[in-house]
UniProtKB/Swiss-Prot annotation:
One Gene Ontology term of the molecular function aspect: structural constituent of ribosome
Organism in which the protein naturally occurs: Clostridium botulinum (strain Eklund 17B / Type B)
Keyword terms, alphabetized: Ribonucleoprotein, Ribosomal protein, RNA-binding, rRNA-binding, tRNA-binding
Name of the protein described by the UniProt record: Small ribosomal subunit protein uS7
Amino-acid biosynthesis keyword on record: no
Chain's role: One of the primary rRNA binding proteins, it binds directly to 16S rRNA where it nucleates assembly of the head domain of the 30S subunit. Is located at the subunit interface close to the decoding center, probably blocks exit of the E-site tRNA.
Subunit relationships: Part of the 30S ribosomal subunit. Contacts proteins S9 and S11.
UniProt record, GO biological process: translation
Top-level lineage group: Bacteria
Gene3D superfamilies reported in the protein's UniProt record: Ribosomal protein S7 domain
Matching NCBIfam families: rpsG_bact (TIGR01029)
Gene Ontology cellular component list: small ribosomal subunit
Amino acid sequence: MPRKGHIAKRDVLPDPVYNSKVVTKFINSIMEDGKKGVAQKICYEAFELIAQRSGKEALEVFEEAMNNVMPLLEVKARRIGGATYQVPMEVRTERRQTLGIRWMLIAARKRGEKLMCERVAGELLDASNNTGAAVKKREDTHKMAEANKAFAHYRY
């Protein structure tokens, strides 16, 4: 535990184009080696591709995709009397968002398209249609939680 008390969580500023904090977090997660300009370019180009391919507004598709990827339950290892149990837990809102973004980008990076903006656009479109690797990751997490429902009383 920290000796100097609780550290306040820094708030992110909304992005300049869509005025959304979630988009800013998404851009920050895309960013590598502090190159925010490159990350913004990738994100906004992906959003343009989404608007062209789907015919819907890009932010709408993005929010729908995020809702389809963010997990409601996860399992945490808890050691009780020499045995380790996978205990299902509800996921806090902040962590839901973080996991959703992380899974989305991991799935996008594994895709086969040549450009990163195309990969991100493809994964977001798939996720908005409830398909794709990121949605599968969420379903697997929920299945794990469901399978270990018997240990739910070990919650802490």
